């Protein structure tokens, strides 16, 4: 199969993932900004990763937050924490990222991270020139319903790139499902945190490195 477009997830694919404790501390800081210094640990956990609109509504009701303001502040605080991780050298690109410079197809990014974080990382690591489009989430509660496996942002990227035969590369099962929902092929990349991962989905390709894309895209 020859692909004319490749789209990537960002965290865990192009750059290293942010440690969970960093995200949790940033979420705790968000509560503190609203005057809550001892929130229920379960509420912090719910707001750290994978929050749903209903969970945001529940937490906001418990602490008398305005939901959109709380979530906007949470996203901003978590983004700033990730930016600091990058500046400190604790969140860095994977070593095989350079191989994409020779991949002669239009490329894009679709991440469930904040748009602010995606934009910062592209600029900070000076890799924005590799990609023709890049989508993250807006800092809104509605964006939580548009995360992968919803193909919303992926379909926007494919439209930007005028893709006819596209491949989406990810490190999560939600990435593979998003590709399926968008009607395109997928590649699951076996980064160290996924080396022994047992999949419950069926990607088109199972790869160890971004280098593998050269053979795949010309197969």
Predicted regions and their residues:
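Extended substrate/RNA-proximal surfaces in nucleic-acid metabolism proteins
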Residues: 108
């Amino acid at each position: 199969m020859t692909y004319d477009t490749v789209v990537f997830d960002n965290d865990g694919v192009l750059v290293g993932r942010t440690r969970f404790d960093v995200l949790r501390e940033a979420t705790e800081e968000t509560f503190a900004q609203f005057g809550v210094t001892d929130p229920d640990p379960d509420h912090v956990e719910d707001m750290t990763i994978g929050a749903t609109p209903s969970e945001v509504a529940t937490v906001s009701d418990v602490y008398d937050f305005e939901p959109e303001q709380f979530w906007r502040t949470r996203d901003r605080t978590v983004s700033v924490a990730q930016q600091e991780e990058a500046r400190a050298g604790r969140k860095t690109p994977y070593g095989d990222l350079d191989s994409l410079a020779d991949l002669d197809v239009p490329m894009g990014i679709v991440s469930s991270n904040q748009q602010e974080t995606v934009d910062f990382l592209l600029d900070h690591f000076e890799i924005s020139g590799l990609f023709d489009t890049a989508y993250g989430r807006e800092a809104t509660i509605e964006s939580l319903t548009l995360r992968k496996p919803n193909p919303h942002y992926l379909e926007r990227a494919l439209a930007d790139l005028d893709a006819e035969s596209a491949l989406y590369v990810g490190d999560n099962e939600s990435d593979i499902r998003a590709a399926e929902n968008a009607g395109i092929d997928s590649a699951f990349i076996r980064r160290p945190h996924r080396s022994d991962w047992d999949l419950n989905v069926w990607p088109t390709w199972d790869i160890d490195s971004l280098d593998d894309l050269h053979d795949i895209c010309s197969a």
